[in-house]
Amino acid sequence: MTSLVDDYFDDVISRLVALKRDARAGIERAIEAILGVVQSDGRVFVFGTGHSHVIAEETHYRAGGLAITVPILTGATRVKDGAVAGTVYERTPGIVGPILERYGVGRTDLLIIVSNSGVNAAP
């Protein structure tokens, strides 16, 4: 009988192999887009609502990191006021416009949107 640990690692490995096969072209396009931003002295903004904002937080540069990353963090679309309030805000059409204006996302910048479901008005 295999152990749960073996089952876990086998599952993770099979998912990584599938990701490499299925998402390679998209990942390569993302790399090229980020490289273009670096070469044009732009910034990489990352935005997510609800729990997806954690990904944006993780991109914030640290010592030795890529200092062109800018997480877009706003209380209205995070879960800090509770999941119900966050859900209402992230489903409000137009809520992101003023947020992006405040951050000054420009033509040479890249905006990465993180979404668990892809169904909300925000972003």
Where are the regions that the model predicts?
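A ubiquitous structural signal for well-ordered alpha-helices
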Residues: 8, 15, 30-33, 95
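Generic N-terminal amphipathic, Lys/Arg-enriched alpha-helix
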Residues: 1-22
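Short, contiguous, pocket-lining structural segments
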Residues: 4, 26-29, 51
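Charged catalytic carboxylate motif
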Residues: 11, 26-29, 122
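A short, well-structured juxtamembrane/interface segment
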Residues: 22-40
